[in-house]
Amino acid sequence: MSSLPTSDGFDHPAPSGQSPEVGSPTSLARSVSASVCAIKPGDPNSIESLAMEATKASAEFQTNSKKTDPPPLQVLPDLASSAEQSLAMPFHKSSKEAVVAGNLEKSVEKGTQGLRVYLHTRQDASLTLTTTGMREPQIFAEEKSWHPENQTPSPVNGLQQHRETGSVQREAGQQSVPQDQGCLCDAEDLELHEEVVSLEALRKGELQRHAHLPSAEKGLPASGLCSCPCSEALMEVDTAEQSLVAMCSSTGRQDAVIKSPSVAHLASDNPTMEVETLQSNPSCEPVEHSILTRELQLPEDNVDMSTMDNKDDNSSSLLSGHGQPSVESAEEFCSSVTVALKELHELLVISCKPASEESPEHVTCQSEIGAESQPSVSDLSGRRVQSVHLTPSDQYSQGSCHQATSESGKTEIVGTAPCAAVEDEASTSFEGLGDGLSPDREDVRRSTESARKSCSVAITSAKLSEQLPCTSGVEIAPELAASEGAHSQPSEHVHNPGPDRPETSSVCPGAGLPRSGLDQPPTQSLSTPSVLPPFIFPAADVDRILGAGFTLQEALGALHRVGGNADLALLVLLAKNIVVPT
């Protein structure tokens, strides 16, 4: 008998009629299991060698089973028929063959299962190494998570287990079939190997798909596998953006300094202004700052408004510093204006004094100095023509001079009047003008009526002597009466001049034109009636204003406007007469 060395170091005799490989099934199972279990996870070549050994062992087992013709285990009628047909084969031989076949089947099944588990673990570990490239602790955690003890069932695992059980059943069926089906065992074994390879490829594809998905069972997020390259890329982008921001902020600061120093100061103090100047620069394109630009639109508007306010404040301060004088400068300006107006007042008084000195000679009695009054009348007519071309302010000054002339020559007119009626009416007219300071309206009305009567009497008396003195009397007396009556008497008295107009027109037909011209101011005063309320002012102030060449009504109006201050009233009246050349 031949003996086979086993793993335990003893030689077991092989039974007669059997090959040495089949004679010791226990040693064969031990050798196969030892060869399968001695796996080192470090060398990938051992996996292929073990797979080749397993396939060789299965092939040898199939050839031995063909030679020995073992009876099937599952089909009992076949076993009984074979026992009846082969009477020479003892019963213990068939039982030993069944035990050997069962041991071989179990050993092969265990070896294939261990090999598949190791292949599965090895492929997962290599897949994690190639896809993630992570550190050794992560690889260790990955291998630990894919260990069969920690692995959770999944549809792919369930499918693989189902196929594994199916393959085990196929192997059991292949080993239990009779000899006539032995040729099909090799084909099925090859198909099983191909299915295992395809299943492993499918498993690799599924792992590659689900490598980026988060998994709660692993304890580590699957998205963290790609965190290292992604974080490196993001850090590179961040550094590029920071360099771009630094360059653009420097250029933006230079532009801001060139444009406006205040905005540059704000940009150096406020970091948001640096980003705004960066984004306002067209050469700097924002990379991923769309949200930042939207958030910084309002601060930019606020900064623009603040700069505008600062500019407005600066401009207003400049205007207030240069355009508007201070209190001291205003006082100096007023004092200088006061001095200038006083000088102007003195000039006006000096210019009016020769006319007042010459007026008594011209306003003498027409009957006594008819021939001598002709030059004066021509002079007055010339002045009248000049007054037509003058401005209203000049006309006011001329009227004031005429009034001063008439007032200064009041006594001489009274003393040299040709008749008593003219003397009485002239005295009453000038007394009425003097009484115009009182607030009684009846006195004012009497003064105007007496002035008109004196005008008519003067016209009638002058008609007897000459025609020209008549026109001169019409020019002087109605002018005084109209200037006083237009401002002092009520509107109904101005509108109704009285029955003296027909006498004037009938006695002196040449006086109609100046009367019509002098009736226009009362009609203008109707639209804007200037009836002043009665005020009592000091006579000295009124005389002072009258001495400056202004009318009584102008003096009263100016005093009423400034509240009784004679200096201010005089300044107001002088300012009205100033004509600025253009």
UniProtKB/Swiss-Prot annotation:
Q: Name one GO biological process term.
A: negative regulation of protein localization to plasma membrane
Fetch the InterPro entries from UniProt. UBA (IPR015940)
Spell out the Polar residues composition-biased ranges. 16-32, 148-179, 390-408
| Compartment(s) of residence | Cell membrane; Nucleus; Golgi apparatus, trans-Golgi network
Annotated region Disordered: where? Answer: 1-32, 56-76, 143-180, 303-325, 363-384, 390-409, 426-452, 483-529
> Tissue range of expression?
Expressed in epithelial and subepithelial cells of small intestine.
- The primary site where this protein sits is membrane
Q: List compositional bias (Basic and acidic residues) regions by residue number.
A: 438-452, 490-503
The source's superkingdom equals Eukaryota
One GO CC annotation, please? brush border
Q: What happens when the gene is disrupted?
A: Mice show a specific phenotype: first, a post-transcriptional up-regulation of SLC5A1 in the small intestine, with an increased d-glucose absorption rate and capacity; second, an increased food intake that results in a visceral type of obesity.
Task: Enumerate the UniProt keywords alphabetically.
Answer: Cell membrane, Golgi apparatus, Membrane, Nucleus, Transcription, Transcription regulation
Give the UBA domain ranges: 536-576
Q: Which parts pass through the membrane? A: none
User: How is this protein organized at the quaternary level?
Assistant: Interacts with YRDC.
Free-text function comment from the UniProt entry? Mediates transcriptional and post-transcriptional regulation of SLC5A1. Inhibits a dynamin and PKC-dependent exocytotic pathway of SLC5A1. Also involved in transcriptional regulation of SLC22A2. Exhibits glucose-dependent, short-term inhibition of SLC5A1 and SLC22A2 by inhibiting the release of vesicles from the trans-Golgi network. Regulates the expression of SLC5A1 in a tissue-specific manner and is specifically involved in its regulation in the small intestine.
Q: What protein is this chain from?
A: Regulatory solute carrier protein family 1 member 1
